[in-house]
Amino acid sequence: MIWLMKYLTIFLLLLLVHPQTLAADHCAVLQYHHISEDTPGITSVTPEQFQQHLDYLLQNDYAVIPLETVITALKTGAELPDRCVALTIDDAYISAYTEAFPRTVRYEYPLTVFVATEAVDEGRDGHLNWDQMRQMHSKGVSFQNHSHTHTHLVRRLENESPDDWEQRVAADIQTAQNRIQQELGVTPTLISYPYGEYNEALKLVVISMGLTAFGQQSGQIWQEADFTSLPRFPLASFYARMRTFTKKVNSLPLPITGACPLDPVVPLDDWQPALMLIFNPDVENIRQLRCFVNG
């Protein structure tokens, strides 16, 4: 059966913030791919847009924090500063070096890059090389796992058993772990799923490897989140405009205690997938809730 990631793009945001709060238990993680005017719009912001984003964060006193620091705080119950933001880039495209890197260094903003290591090893056009990453790493940029091959990890090959799939996927992720450690001298603790795709079986693989994982679904991360499928705000094209950017960084986490179904992968022929969310009974401002679904 052909499987497809269930991109409902459930854009569930509580849009009011509490300006009197000086500490928080949540953070907005921003996701970029290309920072260029010459790459596909669906995965790109222009250098001008990226600059506008950084300027907004600076001018409005956002605390831009290393992603690993955010995760440690959330897992241990430590407080985060109000208006917490973390910057991430997926795929290690060359614009991470030419456009993002000099700007984040200038602003003294930490940056995390999720690397699909096969593309780097093969020297594919438009990607970083290891020397560039070593230079970035020396200035504090964190490099994390994005798998080795950047394939659709949730999909089984033809006639592939569940056990064989698990071994193949674990080996793919471990290869990326090894290559980053060999080249940069650090062992990743984080992974972002290629294409944001995950299912319950893949989450179990990630758990067995001791990794914290991110998807591409929108939302703030917080202390009660699932650390095998943390949300990020994808920024590209229309969704990188300042009007939507400001809403994302000013949102609050969605306080749910459960969801059904747990597995976000559905058959391709399922045209009416359903999602049930169970809210924390103590949630405030429930009337502020908005739901936007691609359809």
Segments (PLM) and residue ranges:
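Metal-dependent polysaccharide deacetylase catalytic core of the NodB/CE4 family, i.e.
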Residues: 25-40, 60-63, 80-85, 93-95, ...
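Sec-dependent N-terminal signal peptides
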Residues: 7-17
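Beta-strand-enriched, solvent-exposed domains that form extended recognition/catalytic surfaces
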Residues: 256-295
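Short, compositionally biased P/S/T/A/G/V-rich stretches that sit at domain boundaries
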Residues: 235-269
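Catalytic-core region of carbohydrate-active enzymes that cleave or remodel glycosidic bonds
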Residues: 175, 180-183, 203, 207-218
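N-terminal pre-catalytic segment of deacetylase/amide-hydrolase enzymes
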Residues: 21-85, 249-263
